Curated annotation (Swiss-Prot):
The keyword Nucleus is assigned to this record: yes
Record keywords, A-Z: Chromosome, Developmental protein, Differentiation, DNA condensation, DNA-binding, Nucleosome core, Nucleus, Spermatogenesis
Location(s), subcellular: Nucleus; Chromosome
Protein name: Protamine-1A
Top-level taxonomy: Eukaryota, Metazoa, Chordata, Craniata, Vertebrata
Subcellular location, principal: nucleus
GO terms, biological process: cell differentiation; chromosome condensation; spermatogenesis
UniProt organism field: Oncorhynchus mykiss
Function: Protamines substitute for histones in the chromatin of sperm during the haploid phase of spermatogenesis. They compact sperm DNA into a highly condensed, stable and inactive complex.
Tissue specificity field: Testis.
Region (Disordered): 1-31
One Gene Ontology term, aspect cellular component: nucleus
Molecular function (Gene Ontology), one example: DNA binding
Amino acid sequence: MPRRRRASRRVRRRRRPRVSRRRRRGGRRRR
């Protein structure tokens, strides 16, 4: 029987360092 995750109202927020939107991995955007 697969485990079910209980939906909790309280969501734990992960602290993440602020990253500027312009510079992401690699800096330049490729398409």
